[in-house]
């Protein structure tokens, strides 16, 4: 997206706007302890030197991010490419180590857990990746793909794993006979259902979905989003949804966070952000959404008929 907003203008409001008009990035969604709490999260990546005596430089992918998500709620993270969305997802999933800050899930600091503790904790949080073609191993049947999280936990027999896999496939709209098939035998939407089934099989409390429908046809996107909503209502799942598509966020999320250059610049409900955006970058995102204009009305033409005797 091409925006002509200066860095100084963006930095003028580096924290989300509350209903009172004040900036507040730490207000929880309700009075109960949040399921997920991110505090002053930062991630800096060093840049390679171009010559011997160049001082070390770094990219600040995330800078002081604070957010909370209540159990059973959906939080959308939106922003242009390079805004830090996927970096945030990797840190929440403990796939990367933060430069500073903390990620607490169910009261546990994920980045202070021992490897064995983290492996067991992963039962409570899973991820759905963007590409349903690249995230599924083409050499493995569906049963092995879906039961990978169970195998990582080191529990249950193969018969129990197959039974659980058949059950979770039915919950995402597939059949138990699909367990022995391979990814190439499915459409893109069906592959993403398999990816959702893999994330769902451990009954997680949190699912991080990184652009879960962006690689799908528009006609299939709504089906997958409706499935995610149904699963949330059935199992009380909490979603952290990473997306650049504002329509997707509006469809699924209770609250939205806008990221720009690694900082939160605005936060609110979809209704608040899409209809009463306060920050210029949020307005720029909204203005970049393609709109279908009504065709201009055709001019009225009078038709004269020649009468013949």
Give the predicted meaning of each segment.
Residues 182-186, 190:
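Conserved ABC ATPase signature
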Residues 3-15, 21-23, 28-34, 47-58, ...:
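Short catalytic/signature loops enriched in Gly
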Residues 201-205:
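A short, proline-enriched helix->beta-strand linker immediately N-terminal to the Walker B motif
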Residues 109, 160-177, 286-287:
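Conserved ABC ATPase "signature" region
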Residues 93:
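Helix-to-loop junction immediately C-terminal to a conserved catalytic motif
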Residues 101-109, 121:
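Conserved ABC transporter NBD signature motif
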């Amino acid at each position: 997206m091409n925006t002509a907003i200066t860095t100084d203008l963006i930095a003028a409001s580096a924290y989300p706007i509350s209903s009172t008009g004040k900036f507040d990035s730490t207000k929880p969604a309700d009075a109960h302890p949040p399921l997920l709490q991110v505090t002053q999260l930062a991630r800096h990546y060093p840049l390679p030197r171009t010559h011997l005596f160049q001082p070390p430089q770094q990219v600040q992918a995330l800078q002081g991010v604070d957010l909370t998500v209540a159990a059973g709620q959906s939080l959308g993270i939106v922003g242009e490419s390079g805004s830090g969305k996927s970096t945030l997802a990797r840190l929440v999933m403990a796939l990367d180590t933060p430069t500073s800050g903390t990620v607490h899930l169910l009261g546990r600091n994920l980045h202070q857990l021992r490897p064995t503790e983290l492996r067991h904790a992963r039962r409570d949080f899973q991820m759905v990746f963007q590409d349903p073609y690249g995230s599924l191993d083409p050499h493995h049947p569906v049963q092995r793909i879906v039961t990978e999280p169970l195998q990582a936990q080191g529990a249950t027999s193969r018969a129990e794993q197959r039974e659980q896999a058949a059950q979770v496939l039915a919950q995402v709209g597939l059949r138990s006979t699909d367990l022995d098939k391979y990814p190439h035998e499915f459409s893109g939407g069906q592959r993403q259902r398999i990816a959702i089934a893999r994330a769902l099989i451990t009954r997680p409390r949190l699912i991080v979905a990184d652009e879960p429908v962006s690689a799908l046809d528009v006609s299939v996107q709504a089906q997958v989003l409706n499935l995610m909503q149904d699963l949330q209502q059935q199992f009380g799942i909490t979603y952290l949804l990473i997306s650049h598509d504002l329509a997707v966020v509006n469809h699924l999320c209770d609250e939205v966070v806008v990221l720009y250059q690694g900082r939160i610049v605005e936060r609110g409900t979809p209704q608040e952000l899409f209809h009463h955006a306060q920050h210029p970058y949020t307005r720029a995102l909204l203005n970049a959404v393609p709109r279908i204009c009504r065709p201009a009305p055709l001019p009225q033409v009078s038709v004269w008929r020649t009468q013949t005797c």
